[in-house]
Amino acid sequence: MGPLKLNTANLSQIVAAGAGRVKVPTYRRGPALKEGIVHVGVGGFHRAHLAVYVDQLMQNHGVTDYAICGVGLQPFDSAMRDALSSQDNLYTVIERSAKGSFANVIGSINSYLFAPDDREAVIAKMAHPDTRIVSLTITESGYYYNENTHELQSEHPDIQFDLDPANEKTPRTTFGFLYAALARRHQQEEWFHHPSHARVFRPSPHPEVAQWITDKGAFPNAMVDRITPQTSPADKESLANTMGIEDSWPVVTEPFMQWVIEDQFSDGRPPFEKVGVQVVKDVHAVEEFEKHKLRLLNGSHSAIGYPGQMAGFNYVHEVLENPDFNKFVWQMMQEEVKPSLPEIPGVDIDQYCKTLMERFSNPTIMDQLPRICLNASGKIPQFIMPSIAEAIWVKGPLRRLCFVAAAWFRYINGVDDQGNTFTVDDPMREELQAKARAGGTKPSELLSITSLFGDDLRNDKRFMQEITNAMEDIARDGILKTLPKYID
């Protein structure tokens, strides 16, 4: 018998064919569930993270009023709409590790709305009384947030479009949809919650709505973590051949999963603690967890991704199989990033770093370097530059961090050390590449983009010397020959 198409009718057969390696939802779905969560951005990470936690609450704790309505805002989200609709909004999460592969069919996404087809339906769903949480998984650029000023990029054409009262019913951005729903809730004088930053609504064309959001909205900070590579055709084929499931768009991920969230909700929340979520009262605790994750995990991903792709590697684990890269990443974490991080009660930073290296080295999830390198202009200012800034402030070591920044500056040109071209997928690609061409092996042109780097870095002689040296060495000798200079 061939693989079974994933849908509600086939679940019992899928379990039988899975020989103990496949779990499926046994709770009632559809009208039996109340959709208390609207989630914008149903990609791989959401389906491997929040949707899994909610599925566990439904499966193991009888929660029925926080099913998820997924929302796609962009034209490319039609692919997810079609995949989910063809299989009753079910999908498979494949966990891979050295111990083997296990599959969980997830049923927590109960419906899906595609905004380009019906924007009003999305606004109405967000504003519906059953909706108690609106959550987001969007890229860094989708936040329209300036890391240097810590404000909304209010001059961006998309934001300007959404600020025009004439366009309230046809928003372009996530925040335009949220504002339209909040304004409707304001009219109804009902409470509303969404996890974002209240400050992004301050440019509102209706001050009374902005004040209502400030008074009655809740905006919990959160830290999320689970490595989730892009799904490949080989992943689909493997699922069909080994577990007998034909899934249009499964998710491959690691066993590790973490979520730390501030306990600040205006209209109730699910009992997240029951499924391992760390719910904390202190917003500063969340911020400290987030700083650890951004600078150690994401910063190390940057140290693997840009130099690794320039050196000709394809996957994260392949980079760390190189002894020089392995030492470099570990030493950068220990000597240049860790000293800037706050201590968190109950968290052993050294053990956290060791766990990260183990996770990065997992060969079974085949984590692609292009995924790591995507949208770097929204990542480097968060993942690498803050550690550099703090090292400058305390006169600490920073040469490895400068090597990573220099590798990205070379990466921007779209040519690796072997002369092979690749696509630089970044919303600022044209400006970045123009600056990179103008600057050559000097960093000044790229560092003049103050929206990414601010004004201070160019004035620090030590930083400028370190990054210039790294850029010149990489240009002359390539990544692999330069790397040993940065290892003790």
UniProtKB/Swiss-Prot annotation:
The keyword NAD applies. Its EC number is 1.1.1.67. GO terms for molecular function: mannitol 2-dehydrogenase activity; mannitol dehydrogenase activity. Belongs to the mannitol dehydrogenase family. Keywords: NAD, Oxidoreductase. This is Mannitol 2-dehydrogenase. Catalyzes the NAD(H)-dependent interconversion of D-fructose and D-mannitol in the mannitol metabolic pathway. NAD(+) binds at I37, V38, H39, V40, G41, V42, G43, G44, F45, H46, R47, A48. Monomer. InterPro entries: 6-PGluconate_DH-like_C_sf, 6PGD_dom2, Mannitol_DH, Mannitol_DH/Oxidoreductase, Mannitol_DH_C, Mannitol_DH_N, NAD(P)-bd_dom_sf. It holds the Pfam family Mannitol_dh. It catalyses: D-mannitol + NAD(+) = D-fructose + NADH + H(+). It is an enzyme of class 1 (oxidoreductase).
